A protein has these predicted regions:
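Solvent-exposed interaction patches of small proteins and small membrane subunits
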Residues: 1-123
């Protein structure tokens, strides 16, 4: 693997780490809530990018996000539970992108602690 590719992996990992390490579990105001949502969204996107990069670097054709997660779990002998959690995180990202109401906001905020732990486990 060349240095540029390694740097891309590092950049994605650093993004996740930088954006979620101090992420509060509960916002104090609307601005902080937006920051939490943005940090979760971009961190999950980086996780999905890492999965796609691993799939490609394993010589497997890259497909849609859920298929890539399944493929990397199978190819790297990861626990199926981890794959399911990564898929759930990707679904949460979709909720973040297409937020429709305050009920979904509560689901997202209630997931912050679990998503932080999952992303740290993944990287």
């Amino acid at each position: 693997m060349d240095e540029i590719r390694i740097k891309r992996y590092r950049d994605k990992i650093n993004h996740i780490t930088d954006y979620i390490k101090d992420l509060p579990l509960e916002p104090k105001n609307e601005l902080e809530k937006r920051g939490i949502f943005y940090s979760l969204q971009t961190s999950i996107e980086s996780m999905v990018d890492l999965v796609a990069m691993l799939v490609k670097d394993s010589g497997i054709p890259v497909k849609e996000d859920y298929a890539n997660i399944s493929e990397i779990v199978k190819n790297k002998n990861l626990k199926p539970e981890l794959g399911e959690k990564l898929k759930e995180a990707n679904s949460l990202r979709n909720l973040l992108v297409h937020r429709y109401n305050s009920f979904e906001e509560r689901i997202i905020l209630d997931s912050v602690k679990e998503i932080k732990a999952l992303l740290f486990k993944w990287i």
